[in-house]
Amino acid sequence: MLEIIFVAVLLLSSITLIFIERGLTKKNVAILLINYAFLFATIIVIGANWRMIPAYFLLFVLTLQVFLKPKTTAVSKKLVMKVLKGLGIIVTAIAMFTLPLLFPIITLPEPTGKYTVGTKAFHLIDKNRKETTVPNNHRDRELMIQVYYPAEKGSGNPSTYFENINELAEQLAVTNGAPYIVTTHLGLTKTHSYQDAKPLQAQEKFPLLLFGHGMGLYGQQNTFQLEELASQGYVVIALNFTGYAATTIFPNGNRVDSIPIENTPTALNTIVQKWEQDTTFVLNEVIEGNFDKSFKTIADLINYDKIGMFGHSFGGATSAQMLVKDTRIKAAIDMDGGLFGDPMPKDGPQKPFMLMNAEATIHFMKEAKNQKITGIQNELLEIVYLRNKTIEKPGVYTVVIPKTNHTSFTDLAAFSPIINEPDEDVAANYTLINKLVTSFFDQNLKGINENHLEDIQKQYPELQLIKH
């Protein structure tokens, strides 16, 4: 909003300084000072970024109009000059207004729970597995995790969205075929968590949740959700799957970007199996608690009898696999993830499970089933459709959220309306997704709010929520 106000003031000022009167007058200097005040306010509060380049340029031009032009009427006597100036203002105005609207700063919802959220990154090395994912890397398998936890109020410093944000922005641009400049403003995203905050000093123990990101994304891609869950009394560990995440940067500076993958059922099944191995390793390390001395105070918060997992896309598929294979995982959620990996048991997971899908995903799966989509994409969507059906066993929840697509479950839904569904309300979807996920884990790990999921269905009649 501050950027839009700055643009509006700047545009009104340009009418005066270019078309009515230019030159070094008290009025013009005052107009300039007002604009520079807005400029510095936006830079301090939000940060300088590429989306505002047209505005910066126009302010530079207005400054020249005041200090380098004689005091005279600014309207040219030649019609051509008038037209050119007018067109220039129109084009600049359109750019100034549209860029911040098309590429807004991601606004994460403030957590609604009672706990302050702390966060800390850890580096894990699996000495029992060699790196087989990353080409020309024969070291032990390495992973980064980001932990979110209830913390003491007033401790720690505000956390950045992603520690190596420039590298992340660069790689997201590469994988999505976009210019690097388009993603650079990700670094302006403000979080509601505190880096290295002191873990809460309390007798209470909290359930542990593991989070798996989507293919080519990153562990913090669902910060809107990770912070909310920690504020509600969960310790949440977000995994960054090396070689499959957009980028992974280790403490020694070594960087591993995402590798190309083969889009075949066999290859995708194998990838999920690798992610299972990573997740099992992380869970083992967390339970043993010996990988980092500073983790001990966080480990003391955890109730290891109450562990769940959730994830988006391939991270969701991994959550489903962990649920049926690891007795320590008591409940799981798959957010719009095709159920790749090993086939689900005929009787279903036999433990609390929720499969959430975007309305657009369901639409594409039905089109594939009806042969309206051809090629490998059709084959993959058909497999996902059939596997979704096999999971619909007694006790399983299936959810379809209207006006959503695959990205709607992530922070990147707020990156640009260009990638949203028509009439999609990103903020409202974040609220709904958080309600569903928190209520599901509250019910199945904390034993509270037994009917809260059904209550959510009543609040959102357009929501397709079914308990099989």
Feature locations, PLM:
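Alpha/beta-hydrolase active-site loop
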Residues: 243, 248-304
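Membrane-embedded alpha-helical segments of integral membrane proteins
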Residues: 24-70
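Domain-level recognition of soluble alpha/beta enzyme cores
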Residues: 98-209
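Short substrate-entry loop that stabilizes the transition state in hydrolases
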Residues: 190-249, 363-364
